[in-house]
């Protein structure tokens, strides 16, 4: 069984570039362009790790983190964002990232 990583990011170049790099390392990768699609993929199962942006239209990365840690606490979450601030980092960590 392979390790499956879900990448949630509204920036296509980041999402696809990171996905390709991880696939070259032997990981199974699923891509989602927003939080809503990402949460649907998580609900289907078979996700071992989530990498999410914070600032996305619709369901934000913060909401994704809260939902994953609340409903699927065994799935670790990594935040990858260009909108870094101390407040964003603290909020993400408080939510379980």
Model-derived regions: residue spans:
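Acidic catalytic/metal-coordinating carboxylates
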Residues: 3, 34-37, 60-63
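Short amphipathic alpha-helix used as the core "switch/output" element in two-component signaling
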Residues: 40, 62-74, 91-94
